[in-house]
């Protein structure tokens, strides 16, 4: 845990929407008078029929029921496009940066309206209406946003499936939400390689019987694909023939907007359901206040729309606010490790939101690839996806932001719809590695294993004591699982599944998933804490820590470590790292195994697959599960071959 604090600068105190005094006042009102507070904030979106009811929620396990603005009627596409046309129709809505640096284009709000209306009409022509589900299996191209908004325009429910998922994973998700239409592309592009999306989709549909009636195929590469007459539709031909005007479908605030599948600790993936009104209010509000978005900013979130971060902070939040949002098809290290910073200079990006895993990977290449670029346009940095260790935070702040850009280290989940714990750049002194303080309306508590609420400085499990508008409403088709997963462990509270520490200033430090806790000789250790210690060593680029069976301790600590470029593994360095962690955290945290690795198994979105690392450490090589979603599946073979202990 870092003891450094970075105060809010005078510039940010004066310029930001929210300063410290305003945060304190607004937060107090949001907790004490939620109906009044959210009744006002709900007006940030336009309503066809205004709401009269604001909050109607229950966390009682016998009756979990979450409703916000429930008697209001609106439309998400109207709020993200139509209402901006009169004042910013010619403003860029989406900046697209392709995998190839020569491939970029700007799409105005008028052009976005045209494309979305045409695709909405195509969907209607193929029998899609209000309440029907449409699955999207697309690369990071503007057509992904068009498809999401086209569904929203006609009241259809979209289910975006990450383009890195295997045919089996795709099939399971199509079956789960019974999509009659699938929108995909011939191929995707990622790091100079082609991804066979249409071929994968064909294999998936073959496994799902007659659920999918229509497959709409976007031409991305022009590569040869198999074609099923009567089922497959060429996107370009269909939209060219469609009308550029499509009337809005009025939907209730609680009408589902999308289903997004996320992994559960047990069983099949969970179809997280987010609804229209509360979700959009929360996505818009968090985007504006957390990133301090002002007209003229160029905002870039590096996530994929296949994940919730892409939904909330590439598409819905920014577009609801009339922003210019950048969509990036590529990867941080193609064609060079300067790519992120070159894109920032090319498009004059002012707000940059990325994942700690990307920052740590780029740290391994040193400062030179960053410093060869200007980055003068940047004014705010963000972090999302997992806790950022203090060393990566400091590097991000010093090297990328040149010590002038605050970092909003945001904590939230697929289930929360938007950011729950975060600094606000004009209000919150920052501590490297801490998500700091709750956003408006968010009531975090730290509880022990029995559910007793802990006060003051403490460590335990993180729960949220009351609802917020962006919260998921249910698991698609399985409300009992929703209640069991989130409200039964600590009845009356939403259980996040994360561990947490609270310091003397009331700041929250996320310590990692509770299922990423190692129990060493009866002592609980968060893996994030050990990983952070290892990465603090100057020769370490990345680290991932898991538990494995130990005859004496119950669980031992198995550390996978990748080194900085040019550093060779050695027994001496292994001993040095073990001593380093002992000194940093204490003898209880001593790694039993330090496994030097050439790389870690990551999904194409950059998430480290700790499940696979756990199985390798446990020698359960036959139980690795699906590795097809990994950016480089060959890393797994190398890790198995070199397993230690």
Swiss-Prot record:
A GO cellular component annotation in the UniProt record: cytosol
Keyword ATP-binding in annotation: yes
Keyword Kinase: no
UniProt signal peptide: none
Gene3D superfamilies in UniProt: 3.30.300.30, N-terminal domain of ligase-like (3.40.50.12780)
Post-translational modification: Acetylated. Deacetylation by the SIR2-homolog deacetylase activates the enzyme.
Residues that bind CoA: 190-193, 309, 333, 521, 582
Enzyme class: ligase
Keywords, alphabetical: Acetylation, ATP-binding, Ligase, Magnesium, Metal-binding, Nucleotide-binding
Modified residues (N6-acetyllysine): 607
Pfam families (alphabetical): ACAS_N (PF16177), AMP-binding (PF00501), AMP-binding_C (PF13193)
GO biological process, one term: acetyl-CoA biosynthetic process from acetate
PANTHER family: ACETYL-COENZYME A SYNTHETASE, ACETYL-COENZYME A SYNTHETASE 1
Full protein name: Acetyl-coenzyme A synthetase
Species: Beijerinckia indica subsp. indica (strain ATCC 9039 / DSM 1715 / NCIMB 8712)
